[in-house]
Every structure is written in C-alpha cells, then in structure tokens.
Design a protein with these regions (language model features):
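Helix-loop-beta substructure at the N-terminus of cytosolic sensory domains
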Residues: 41-80
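Short hydrophobic/aromatic beta-strand element in the GNAT-like acyltransferase core
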Residues: 65, 134, 146
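A short, aliphatic-rich beta-strand micro-motif
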Residues: 131-139
Length: 180
C-alpha cells in the first residue's frame, strides 16, 4: 500500500522520518499517513477537519483540546469555531486582534506558547490549560483558518510537535486546493 500523495508530499517536504529510538516521530509519521488516507477519501473539508481533530485528540495524550478556527466569510476580521473536540467550552469566535489565535492569523505564522500564564495574549478558555499551539491553514495563499491545540501540561509543544501539526495543516490546505 502506498502513501497518499498529500501525506507523502507533506512528510517529504518537512524532512520528517522516523528514526530508530524516536517513538514520537514514528507515531507522528503513522498518524500523518492515516490522515493522508483520510484526506483522499473525505467528502468535504469539514469531514476531514473532524477526522483530524478526533485523531489528534485520541492519539496525542497531551492534546486536551483540539479544534479549528475558521475565517468568518461574513466577518473576515473574525475567526469562528469549527470542528473541535476536548474537555472544555471554547470561545465561539475570536477577533483577529485578540489572543494567540489572532496572533497566528495576523502574523500568518505558527504560535507556540509553552506557558500561557506568561503570555499576555492568551485568552483563557480553561484554568487547566498550561500550553497552546496555533497553526495557520492556508488555501491558495489566503488564510483559511487554523488548528488550535491546548494542553493541560506546560512545555508540551516541541519543535517536532510543531512540524507535525504544521504537516496536518498542510493536509487540509492540499485538500482545499485539489480540483473538484
């Protein structure tokens, strides 16, 4: 069985391969392959995003809340909650000038905060959250939305974790850009 093209491209472009003794990398690669297959068979982008948040939440034990925030077509300066899973109620919408999600959207760069108590941009969703990562998702160079991950553990997000979630975002971008 061959790796689906979007996942193969993402893994190759990221330079990520499992190395002996690096269990996390292997777990990431296995999950990326699984999500690549999901991207090939998903009927809608919402179905793909649902699969991504569920699998990240189920597989990555320190990912306590995983969700997508999407650019609101009616209010382009606002992110609205998309597919999500986790143990607390998230913000329904976030202005692009607020929070870590707003920072990732306006800078168009991944934001990783391994101690949210030390970052004044953090918008509290739960007192239990200790670290957060927000990864932008682009479609044809325009911001489509972002993957937001909250953890109840400080220092959850390593550079490898960041690359992994950026690869998941690239799968969504690839899905959005494929001809229909």
């Amino acid at each position: 069985m061959t790796l689906p093209e979007p996942a193969a491209t993402v893994i190759k472009a990221s330079g990520r391969t499992a190395r002996p003794g690096v269990e996390g990398m292997s777990k990431h690669n296995d999950l990326l392959k699984e999500l690549g297959y999901a991207a090939q068979s998903a009927r809608t982008v919402d179905a793909l995003m649902d699969t991504i948040v569920q699998r990240l939440h189920d597989t990555m034990t320190r990912y306590n809340w995983v969700g997508f925030y999407l650019i609101d077509k009616a209010r382009p300066a606002t992110l609205v909650l998309g597919p999500h899973v986790g143990s607390f109620e998230p913000h329904e919408s976030i202005s692009l000038d607020r929070g870590l999600c707003g920072a990732a959207a306006t800078t168009k760069k991944t934001v990783v905060v391994n101690d949210v108590a030390k970052d004044p941009r953090y918008l509290r969703g739960s007192e239990l959250v200790k670290s957060e990562m927000v990864v932008p998702v682009f479609s044809r160079a325009a911001l489509f939305g972002e993957i937001d991950i909250n953890s109840y553990f400080a220092n959850t997000f390593t550079p490898e974790e960041q690359q992994f979630v950026e690869a998941c975002a690239a799968l969504v971008a690839s899905y959005l850009e494929k001809p229909r």
